[in-house]
């Protein structure tokens, strides 16, 4: 069985993060960050993030 790829979703709006997960479905494992600082921390703690989707206009 293949390992699910890991996607980090970075957006300050929870609604947007939820919509992305709904669109992409159960094919992937998800990590979520609500700002850039949290995303940087998560990248350091989680080896093997395959893709990062991020909002380019966030307060932090």
Question: Where would I find each of the regions flagged by the language model?
Answer:
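Non-catalytic signal-transmission and effector/linker regions of two-component phosphorelay proteins
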Residues: 1-8, 13
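Conserved sequence signature across two-component system core domains
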Residues: 10-11, 33, 52
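A short coil/beta-turn micro-motif at the C-terminal edge
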Residues: 13-14, 37
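Two-component/phosphorelay signaling modules centered on CheY-like receiver
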Residues: 14-31
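Short acidic/histidine-rich motifs immediately flanking catalytic phosphotransfer sites
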Residues: 46-51
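Receiver (REC) domain active-site loop signature in two-component systems and cognate sites
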Residues: 58
């Amino acid at each position: 069985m293949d390992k699910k790829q890991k996607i980090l979703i970075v957006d300050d709006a929870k609604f947007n993060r939820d919509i992305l997960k709904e669109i992409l479905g159960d094919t992937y494992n998800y990590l979520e960050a609500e700002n850039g600082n949290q995303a940087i921390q998560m990248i350091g703690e989680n080896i093997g993030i395959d893709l990062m989707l991020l909002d380019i206009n966030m307060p932090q």
